[in-house]
Amino acid sequence: MPQVQSTVILPPLITSSIFRDDQGRAMIASRRSFARITDAIELPKLIETQIDSFRWFQREGLRELFDEINPIDDFTGKNLELSFSDYEFGEPRYNEFECRERDMTYAAPLRVRVRLKVKTTGEIKESDIFLGDFPLMTNNGTFVINGAERVVVSQLIRSPGVYFKEEKEPTSGRSLHSAKLIPNRGAWLEFETNKRDVLSVKVDRKRKLPVTILIRAVLGLFGDKPLDQCGLNEDVIALFANVDVNRDHQYIASTLDKDPSTNAKEAIMELYKRLRPGDPATVDNARSLLETLLFNARRYDLGKVGRYKLNRNLWEKSRLFEGQEIPSLTMRVLSKADLFKIVERLIDLNNGIGNPDDIDHLGNRRVRTVGELIQTQFRVGLLRMERVIKERMSLQEPEAATPNGLINIRPVVAAMREFFGGSQLSQFMDQTNPLAELTHKRRLSALGPGGLSRDRAGFEVRDVHHSHYGRICPVETPEGPNIGLIGTMSTFARVNEMGFLETPYRRVYREVDNAPLWLERGMTTRDVRHLSTGELIARAGARVDAELAKIIAIGVLNGQLLREDIVNPATGDLIAEAGSEIDRALATKIADLPLRAIKIHPVVTNETDYLPADEEDKFIIAQANALLDERFRFIDPTVSCRHAEDFVQAPIASVDYMDVSPKQVVSVSTALIPFLEHDDANRALMGSNMQRQAVPLLRPDAPIIGTGMEHKAARDSGQVVVARADAVVLSSNSERILVRENDGTERTYPLLKFLRSNQDTCINQRPSVFIGDKIRAGEVIADSSSTQNGELALGQNILVAYMPWEGGNFEDAILVSERLVREDIFTSIHIEKYEVEARDTKLGPEEITRDIPNVGQDSLKNLDERGIIYVGADVQPNDILVGKITPKGETDLTAEERLLRAIFGEKAREVKDSSLRVPNGVKGKVIDVKVFTRDETTEMPVGVNQTVRVMLCQKRKISPGDKMAGRHGNKGVVSRVLPIEDMPFLPDGTPVDIVLNPLAVPSRMNIGQILETHLGWAASRLGFRIATPVFDGARDEDIIKALAESGLPSDAKIDLYDGRTGEKFDNPVTVGYKYMLKLAHLVEDKIHARSTGPYSLVTQQPLGGKAQFGGQRFGEMEVWALEAYGAAYILQEMLTVKSDDVVGRVKTYEAIVKGDPINEAGVPESFKVLIKELQSLGLSVDVLTADERPVELTDSEADDLISLDGINLSGMEKGEL
């Protein structure tokens, strides 16, 4: 039975796990937990939503689609009928790893059994049809599409159903209500009330019409009388006589006054005219339109969810329910009763009865998981294929038709390719570190097809809502335009079969069933356990006779406290008083009484119920920190609870449920922030987001101050290797782990070595078990780049001091010690991929070769005989990685060239150098080279003969300009790397590693970082790691006790000495160990310099951005600065020769090279463009000098421009020069 908070404060628990040091010796990694509350249930598998959803699609989702489309008849319906029956997924041709290597899609062939019936002869033809390769989900919840891992993000959208909304009428201030009926597929119905009490409806967003027209039409459609005798005024008034009772506002009467029709026939015709203006209206046409629009299952589908919401909102909330039969969940189309109920409820709301719906409530928003999103897209492909099949059926002879001849799979394959390659919800996986990967799979997006757009989304939909509690994290969301539209599932949240988010709660028993009630039930529906001890009394499914009913009642009652007197109803004798503890003898007496239920002092059990948001609103729910005694009974008479959107202090007798854990409200990323409860929410948001940007470091180091979530997050991320079964390790090396499982089978776990992630970080797995070790199923046996001993390790534990230092940490700048550089503490590995293809061109095939024209031997020194760089070569910017030549266009040959051609044949043919070179600003070591040729694989794109892929690895040390952050949203940029001897040092001579500015703390209100620093210092002295879970972590007194235990001052401040002078600083300084991250915003990726380079073809101004090797924009405000200083010549230079004076910049460059004086600037190209634009408007523009002489503006011809040393300063592209 899990331990729950009691009146006795427990000492901090020690949780241990075995790991080994660098020499292979077994060590104990202990985390002292300051948690006082133990989670009632274990955390679920964090990526189960993705995996379960895709399995549902494979098992049921596809079956539903084929049932939906079956059967497909030809246009006449008399000749052919085609239907899909069983289907199966074959084995994938390549495994995930091979697909990543070959840039292919990890997919399995989908085969379907198709049955074609020739109706004229009765002949049935069956065959198995290949429906294309269907992308498969990996065990980690991802898809490999064209070699790249992608994630399909779950979408949070408005659920199908009916929604009632309140709006104030501006002139009178009266509340008027409207309703929207949203199906899963089909026409929307929008009902409105105007200030004159007229109810109107819009069908499929067309023109408004009185709602009585629709009511009359529906009465006629389902009536058994002729149309002109149905839907009369008295019929309509009688329908709503029970609800339209307000004499001041007669809604139906007012609407009938505005209704031009008088019976069902006229109403159907009127409806047709409004929906199909211009089409000739006949009764049959009008009737069939209404039927197909709202009552045909192929055109109108509420879906299971739509029907469920409709039943909840209309039937269960109806005050005039009177035992009417609720429509079944399988009834996916509208009924006439549904429409009448909507109008009834609308009139009730207008009369002040009932409440409108809250559209932002999670009971009204559902999650479309990956399986449903794929199903929706697959449906699109199937419907396109159905159209093709019908067309082919009409063209072919029925007897000659075959399933293969009718089916064209291209629409289905294209729909799937379009979804996985181009959908807003199919995203390139964030693989920066394991946490980024895990969080991406748990993300919820309100954007995408059928969702919101970020421009139109208002404040309400983005805001935190009370129904998010335990379902969507209130902290983790992006900053910027997507704030509130993209969220993350909370730690314990799951998606139910309807798509609604659920969260678990512990059941609170306020009364227990007595023997007569158990006997009446006849069978146990679930295991019956003792409420406090969890001891099993009866198993689920047991038949209950009189004897077992008594045993169960005694077993459950034993040990409970009575909440009211027990009186024998037959004699009136008092059996027991309120407050008595029930022993076995008293329990036996009570079980013999004819009482059905016994009220007891509320007991919190470990039975958990997962509740969706609308169900939760009915109950009173206590917080996880409510005080309980050793028998799990509430100690206080009232406890702090939630009830719908209110926080109440409720008597314990009214509590229904209790939270399972303090961290159930937040997401995984937020649950990794220690002392979260001491941080401002804005900073916690930044902390959650920045942890996902942490770059994996060379030597991962798990945090000294953790939250206890590190192990679970690492294990479920998909980047570590987890044992599948209990086993013994036979061998363990850097490449694989071989184990023998308990049943004797041997299994090999291959390890990933220095692989490139989607974000160019390094994925490298290291074994954490050794020969002879016994491992258990689910245990982490190999660490990844950002894990240590199976725990998440995103950063490093660093000794920090909070003090200003000569302006070196002004405005969030960070001063770091050279030790971090020298000892590779914040060094990360980055791997970049460079690829070149040899294609067939019109002038002949390209060739990968070492024989490159106009290239010296020095540039070829690292190339092998094929012209491909060696593995292990160190390369610099502009070095050749792969030599490639491309045929040039034939030109008129001179006599000498013709002679050479005659002597040497094709060898003298002109080729140009198109080699793959290292880009500017990149250097590193080649760690892998792969060559793919058409001979080996047929999967290459058309026209490609050979592909060469080179992997380049860089080791990046921490340097000024790199962004660093803590877990509390405290971010900054490294300003300076200071020699170790200059850093401030402790009295024992230990220099600090980082100096942070104390002014960064008070205004940001993220005090968690200070508490982490204090406790980290104490824990590092005591030699253990700490778990301080969110909302249940170390208190102030715990930190003071830990500081005292480790012999540190109680204020955690100490005298520091200046490393440069050895003098003591004036005041004691806060010092301690803090977990710091290096983020994926590295200065090496951002720093950029240019002298000359490419120019825009139209304006001739330098291009912008590092990717284009562009210049730095000298904008309006910078011009003001030069103007303010009166620097006229610098300003002229900026606007002319440094920008778009084409001839001037070439001449200036030449003058600098030759050491000549620089000539005067010419006319900028942008000025010429302006003149041309004015001339295009029909204006004659002349340019005059100061003395009114005309200036000749000529176009700069390519031939007039000088190009020095092969540098093209003209802005003309290479092919044009």
From Swiss-Prot:
Q: Does the keyword Transcription apply?
A: yes
Q: Which Gene3D superfamilies match?
A: 2.40.50.100, 2.40.50.150, 3.90.1100.10, DNA-directed RNA polymerase, beta subunit, external 1 domain, DNA-directed RNA polymerase, subunit 2, domain 6, RNA polymerase alpha subunit dimerisation domain, RNA polymerase Rpb2, domain 2
One Pfam short name: RNA_pol_Rpb2_1
Please report the name of this protein according to its UniProt entry: DNA-directed RNA polymerase subunit beta
Instruction: Tell me the gene name.
Output: rpoB
A GO MF label: DNA binding
* UniProt source species: Herpetosiphon aurantiacus (strain ATCC 23779 / DSM 785 / 114-95)
Known EC number: 2.7.7.6
HAMAP family per UniProt:
RNApol_bact_RpoB
- Please list the reactions this protein catalyses: RNA(n) + a ribonucleoside 5'-triphosphate = RNA(n+1) + diphosphate
InterPro entries noted in UniProt: DNA-dir_RNA_pol_bsu_ext_1_sf (IPR042107), DNA-dir_RNA_pol_bsu_external_1 (IPR019462), DNA-dir_RNA_pol_su2 (IPR015712), DNA-dir_RNAP_su2_dom (IPR007120), DNA-dir_RNAP_su2_hyb_sf (IPR037033), RNA_pol_bsu_bac (IPR010243), RNA_pol_bsu_CS (IPR007121), RNA_pol_bsu_protrusion (IPR007644)
Tell me which GO cellular component terms the UniProt record holds: DNA-directed RNA polymerase complex
Superkingdom of the organism of origin: Bacteria
Which GO BP terms sit in this record?
A: DNA-templated transcription
Report whether Nucleotidyltransferase shows up as a keyword of the record: yes
